[in-house]
Amino acid sequence: DLALIQTLDFFTPVADDPYDFGQIAAANALSDVYAMGGTPKTALNIVAFPKDMDVEILGEILRGGADKVMEAGAVLAGGHTIQDDTPKYGLSVTGFVDPRKFWKNFGAQTGDKLILTKALGAGIVNTAIKADLVTEGARKAVLASMKKLNRDACEVFKEFEVHARTDVTGFGLGGHATEMAVASDRTVVIDTEKLPVLPDVEEFASMGLIPGGAYRNREFA
């Protein structure tokens, strides 16, 4: 038996290069399927684009998204575009999962270990990029991380008993961990000294290069 997964996600540009942005947005949308233990099968583009912006930029965004969908082994079956003052891109993704191995973002148990598949700090590095204060090493690292599919991690976790799982995105580790703990009627203890972070994140944070959403996440967590 198979269960159907349907999800969507889109956002404004987080990279200067439109091709990179397309890949990042697609990887982000596909991640929701992997977080549930599923396999993406088809995807539809979700696009908002300004009428006075070079259409070649849109072409590069779509090319990046298409390449990432292909990398995931899924089929890009079309999409929809609207006119907007700010470009936005993402995907609606359809996938399948074995209902006996469907991972939810609740059900964590006492004694469970928290495992991260990627280093933290993308929001801080992107803030440094916008301020033109980023190092080249940090720029390359954050782009590689955001473009990387969680497919391999998903396949590894299928070999183990997983009680709860989520993907860490806009609400950060604190927000998503809190959400999972509350839904599981548990608390979570995090040793911040052991958290993996992207290059130069601590330096950027000490400079005050922290996205506004991080403060809201802290209040929630």
Each model region followed by its residue ranges:
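Active-site glycine-rich loop that binds ribose-phosphate moieties when present
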Residues: 92-102, 136-158
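Acidic-glycine-rich active-site phosphate/pyrophosphate-binding loop
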Residues: 1-5, 147-154, 221
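Short, solvent-exposed amphipathic alpha-helical segments in soluble enzyme
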Residues: 20-24, 107-108, 130-133, 177-185, ...
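Glycine-/charge-enriched secondary-structure boundary and capping motifs
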Residues: 51-75, 82-87, 159-160, 165, ...
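Glycine-rich anion-binding loops of enzyme active sites
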Residues: 2-14, 39-134
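Alpha-helix C-terminal capping segments
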Residues: 31-39, 179-184
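Alpha-helical scaffold segments that flank or form the walls of functional sites
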Residues: 19-36
